[in-house]
């Protein structure tokens, strides 16, 4: 095991092969990079990814002021997103004493969270602002969140996923008074490896393009699998991809 190495910074895939003598490399770096909306104000103090918010609260005990990793609990919190992780973040913030809103651009029928997760969130007192989409996070003079601009949405024709596409309702702009915004929009592969590896093809979601049967990528000697290829998925699929990649590498090295 070689720790404290960041592929793409400390070294690169090309260096592993050309300089360090590795004959094959398997990329299983996952899809842990939180997604953001790309709206103004996202860098303000008080904006968190759901991953960071939940990790700091649960693993680092940030809810306890005596610990070294405190986190401002917030009194008026908006969670952007509608998945199971969004429900976790909303219920955590609620239990820390905040008024919490789930902000989701589609209707309740399109919520990706499990029905029971939505039920429990409502039961605890989370407010659901559906058919609502943020356009800007408002920031005070000290760089802290003070609110959020939103627009109301309505459902139009189905998109490529089969769900009806949200369309902005003209003249529906409004503001929410907030001190914390939690982004729960899913995760994607970190592009650091792919952007520093010439000849390694990725798709439009920045996932590495690899053969499902053996993990082979577009770069000779480089194999990949798991969430780095599929996007965020399940452990069992990642395990299967690892086995397929091992088989592919064995066959590749056997022919050399």
Say what each PLM segment does.
Residues 1, 90-136:
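Rossmann-like dinucleotide-binding cores of NAD(P)H-dependent redox enzymes
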Residues 6-11, 54-56, 108:
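Short acidic loop-to-helix transition motifs that present clustered carboxylates
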Residues 43-74, 158-232:
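FAD-site-proximal beta/loop scaffold in flavoenzymes
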Residues 62-98:
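Rossmann-like NAD(P)H-binding beta-loop-alpha module
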Residues 225-256:
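A conserved FAD-binding loop/helix module that cradles the flavin
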């Amino acid at each position: 095991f070689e720790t404290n190495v960041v592929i793409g910074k400390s070294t690169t895939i090309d260096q592993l092969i050309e300089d360090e003598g590795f004959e094959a490399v398997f990329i299983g770096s996952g899809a842990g990079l939180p997604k953001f909306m790309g709206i103004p104000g996202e860098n303000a103090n008080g904006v968190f990814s759901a991953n960071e918010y939940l990790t700091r609260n649960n693993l680092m005990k940030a809810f306890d002021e005596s610990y070294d990793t405190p986190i401002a609990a917030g009194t008026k919190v908006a969670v952007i997103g509608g998945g199971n992780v969004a429900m976790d973040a909303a219920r955590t913030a609620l239990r820390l004493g905040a008024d919490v809103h789930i902000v989701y651009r589609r209707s309740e029928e399109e919520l990706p969270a499990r029905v029971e997760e939505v039920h429990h969130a409502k039961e605890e007192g989370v407010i659901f602002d559906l058919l609502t989409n943020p356009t800007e996070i408002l920031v005070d003079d000290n760089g802290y969140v003070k609110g959020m601009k939103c627009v109301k949405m309505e459902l139009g024709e189905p998109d490529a996923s089969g769900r009806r596409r949200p369309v902005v309702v003209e003249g529906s702009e409004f503001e929410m008074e907030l001190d914390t915004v939690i982004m729960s929009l899913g995760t994607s592969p970190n592009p650091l490896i792919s952007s520093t590896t010439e000849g390694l093809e990725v798709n439009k979601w920045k996932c590495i393009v690899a053969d499902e049967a053996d993990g082979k990528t577009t770069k000779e000697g480089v194999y990949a699998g798991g969430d780095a290829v599929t996007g965020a998925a399940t452990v069992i699929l990642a395990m299967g991809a690892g086995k397929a990649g091992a088989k592919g590498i064995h066959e590749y090295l056997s022919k050399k």
